[in-house]
Amino acid sequence: TEATTKYFLTQAAASAVLLFASTTNAWTTGTWDITQLTNNPACIMLTMALSMKLGLAPLHFWLPEVLQGIPLNTALIITTWQKLAPISLLYMTHNAIHPPILLTMGILSTLVGGWGGLNQTQTRKIMAFSSVAHLGWMASVTTINPNILLINLFLYIIMTTTAFMMLIYTSSKTIKDLTTSWMISPPTTAMMLILLMSLGGLPPLTGFVPKWVILQELTTNHLSMTATIMALSALLSLFFYLRIAYTSTLTTFPTTTQNTNKWRFLPKSNTTVISLMLLPSILILPMTPMLML
């Protein structure tokens, strides 16, 4: 399909740039160890390659289009599991990464992720821009404290997985579909409101933890302006999360009184996994000191 081709070409191009960075460094220094890059052009190429693989702005062009062209199950894998390999490389090579470029991309990603999601009606594209914004927060702290990157990744995967599982359970591909999700599963729809607020970063929910820790780390390292811009950009993301929450839980799609409530007649489905994933997605804030050890 078109989405598959876009994903393959983008990842192949990024892998080629990554290999070229390693080759360039080996040519000038004589070592093939990618974690010890000392050649400046190779460091820049490595940063750009990993940014393209992750979908950081301005190299995020492929992510919304790819997610829009694939099923929700596959979109879940691409936004979570497929981020592990490039972020592992980012963690291992954080000493060789070009800090100003990565920090700039981090700020751009939070802004683009917020702005891009404002006018979207497709849930997959909204989750794509949400992913771009979250990755921007991760990128901004990578060269300062890579351990915070891992905490952020862990929480991001939990929250995004839960959100996609809820969308899959209610078969919601557009915001319009969310208006009828209450007929499929009222409890799931009610919990989706809290989960979306967590993704938006509202305290006292889990999503507040990475934003709080990252802003604290940036301020400690005298990057107050960067922290301010990123905190303001979080309001953009929060707006479209609120819009989805309002549509899904506080509005009712026009129906007749004879309309059947699907949840009464649907066979009982197992929501144990969603329930187990939902708990850490909204209740990890009190455990923050333990995560920071």
Regions found by a protein language model. Give the residues of each.
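Core, highly hydrophobic multi-pass alpha-helical transmembrane subunits of bioenergetic inner membranes
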Residues: 1-293
